[in-house]
Amino acid sequence: AIWMVYKLLNRNKKVVDSNMENIIFDVGQVLVKYDWETYLDSFGFPKEERDKIAEVVFQSNTWNERDRSSETEQYYVDQMVKAAPEYEKDIREVMRRSDETIEKTDYAETWVRYLKDKGYHVYILSNYATDTLERTEDKLTFLKYVDGAVFSCQVKQIKPEPEIYKTLLGRYHLDPEKSVFLDDRAENCEAARKQGIHAIQFKSFKQAAAELEKLG
């Protein structure tokens, strides 16, 4: 897989030709696969139950606030259960194994290393719950190559709120005009642009890498 990644990247492009200095990555659906639907389907719940659990867990405001991690994991799971108490046992099991929604990609580590080799500074800005981070950190092998990271659970801020972008820029003294942010969600990209950061909405590795090369 590594040679395929390098084949897609322009290895002759030099960072000295660019105004871009900093590459900022989201994690879920960018550097790792995040697929809650396939994970939830794997339980084989009846459709009515499956859809209700999707609603009160993965599609809920509680799930989003869990990324902020201002409360304990137990608190967030209890809130989900309160929304559908008839499915308490299954909700708790779904949450107990929720790290299974995250899978490594075959390009992330190579991509980050490639950008570092070109002289870019690489950072992480990601909505990530404390419990999930603790249980999936072994899948985030690219972290050892980055220059810095802001995870929502560590700063109690979440995208697309402006504060989390300001936290990243301030902590690492980044010039937004010399920075580009890659995220799969349009609203998160737009929030970055409002802070003066260039943004690319990630749809695939090939598409994002090509847009990044054009920008950089």
Located regions from the model:
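N-terminal helical cap/lid subdomain that shapes the substrate entry/recognition surface
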Residues: 18-110, 117, 129-132
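Hydrophobic residues in well-ordered beta-strands that form the structural core
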Residues: 33, 124-126, 201
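Glycine-centered short loops/turns at secondary-structure junctions
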Residues: 117-119, 196
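Generic structural signal for small/hydrophobic residues in well-ordered secondary structure
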Residues: 26-29, 69, 115, 124, ...
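Asp-based, Mg2+/Mn2+-dependent phosphohydrolase catalytic module
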Residues: 6-11, 15-20, 129-130, 134-216
